[in-house]
C-alpha cells in the first residue's frame, strides 16, 4: 500500500502548486463520489484549475481519474443526455491534452463493460491503482470533492 499525501482543499492545493517556481512532474485529479450528477460540477472545477496551472506551467502533465458513480455519466449511452459534459471532457482530452481514466472495477460491479464507454475514455483496470501509478511517477494528487 502506498502512503497517499493528506491534502487540504483542492483550491489550496492548486494555489500551493502555483506558488512554486518549478512544476511537479504532473497533476492527477481524483473524482470519486456516490453521485451520478457530480461529474458535471467536478469537470467545471477541474477545467478552471487546468487553465490556472497551464497559464503558469504550459507543459504540465495532467490526468483525471474518475472512479465513483459519477463515471457512469461518461458512458456511450449517456452521450445524448450528457452531451455538454461529453463535449467538455473531449475538449479537455483533445485541446488540453489531459489523460482521462475511469475505473473498470467499479464499472464491473454494476455489470458495465469497458466497451460501454466511448473511445475517448480510457477504462483503467482499477482507478485507485491508476492514481497510485501517477503518484509514483511524481504527480501531485488533487482530490475533487463535493
Question: What annotation goes with each model-predicted range?
Answer:
Residues 34, 67-70, 105:
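Solvent-exposed coil/turn segments that connect beta secondary-structure elements
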Residues 25-27, 58-60, 96, 119:
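Envelope-exposed proteins and targeting segments
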Residues 41-55:
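Histidine-anchored nucleotide/phosphate-binding helix
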Residues 27-30, 63-66, 99-102, 143:
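Structural recognition of the beta-strand scaffold that forms the well-ordered cores
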Residues 75-146:
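A cross-taxonomic marker for long C-terminal extensions/tails that follow the last structured domain
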Residues 53-64, 102-105:
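Surface-exposed patches in mature extracellular/periplasmic domains of secreted proteins
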Amino acid at each position: 500500500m502506498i502512503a497517499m499525501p493528506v491534502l487540504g482543499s483542492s483550491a489550496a492545493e492548486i494555489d500551493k502548486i502555483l506558488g512554486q517556481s518549478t512544476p511537479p512532474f504532473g497533476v492527477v485529479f481524483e473524482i470519486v463520489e456516490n453521485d451520478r450528477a457530480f461529474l458535471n460540477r467536478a469537470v467545471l472545477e477541474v477545467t478552471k484549475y487546468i487553465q490556472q496551472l497551464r497559464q503558469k506551467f504550459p507543459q504540465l502533465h495532467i490526468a483525471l481519474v474518475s472512479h465513483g458513480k459519477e463515471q457512469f455519466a461518461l458512458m456511450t449511452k449517456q452521450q445524448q443526455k450528457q452531451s455538454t459534459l461529453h463535449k467538455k471532457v473531449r475538449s479537455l482530452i483533445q485541446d488540453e491534452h489531459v489523460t482521462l481514466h475511469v475505473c473498470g472495477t467499479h464499472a464491473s460491479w454494476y455489470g458495465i463493460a469497458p466497451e460501454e464507454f466511448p473511445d475517448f475514455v480510457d477504462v483503467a483496470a482499477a482507478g485507485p491503482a491508476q492514481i497510485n501509478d501517477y503518484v509514483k511517477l511524481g504527480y501531485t494528487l488533487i482530490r475533487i470533492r463535493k
